[in-house]
Amino acid sequence: MTVEYLTEQHKKGRQLIFDLDDTIYVETQFLFKVYKEIAQTAINVNPNLIYNFLKKTFIDDGRKDLFNKLKSSFPSESFSLDKSLSIMRNYKCDHCIETLPWFRKLLSNMSSEFVIKIITNGTPQQQYNKIKSIKLSWPEELIEVVYASSYAAKPKVLSFYQLKGVEKFISPIYVGDSLTDEQFCKKLNIEFYDIKKIL
């Protein structure tokens, strides 16, 4: 399956719906900018040490307890979990993050009326800020985002039914990258397109 497949299916009247993180863009592009901001709050330690710690810990262990690990690894700093989370949830840049090449290619195949439909998990404010930070190069009124966590996070299906005109959808395709996305599609009985196949 390729971008051409998605283009062809859309021409047949099927709706394309997308996950956000690591589907449309690489999430670490955003996260590492946030980590740099958090590192800049350091007073007693070189911010580059903090930044490199956050990056390495995320790559090695994921995001679980990341800021608690930061606090315990740099006891001379007065890192506040609340302050770090606040930076995390409120950071945005002005269209500073590129979409993945496959997504740009897909959009170049679409008509000017194509609506980018996104269903994304995560803290709604942070996901909103990510959308604002991504260079989608598409009219804002043609971007529809459902913040699943405002209803029930994927793989629960409630978020799907928040899309405009969902009752008229014909055999939609959900484009994602994770087991959660795949389970979401199974519960909805819709096609899951694993983007990792073309990345």
Annotate the PLM regions.
Residues 1-51:
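Active-site neighborhood of HAD-like aspartate-dependent phosphohydrolases
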Residues 9-12, 110-114, 164-171:
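Glycine-rich phosphate-binding loop signature in dinucleotide/nucleotide-binding domains
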Residues 41-44, 55-91:
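A metal-dependent, Asp-based hydrolase signature
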Residues 90-118:
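Short, acidic loop-to-helix structural element flanking the phosphoryl-transfer center
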Residues 121, 177, 197:
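Cofactor-binding loop segments of dinucleotide-utilizing enzymes, especially the Rossmann-like FAD-
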Residues 123-173, 179-183:
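Substrate-recognition "cap/lid" segment bordering the active-site pocket of phosphatases
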Residues 177-193:
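Acidic, divalent-metal-coordinating active-site segment for phosphoryl/phosphodiester hydrolysis
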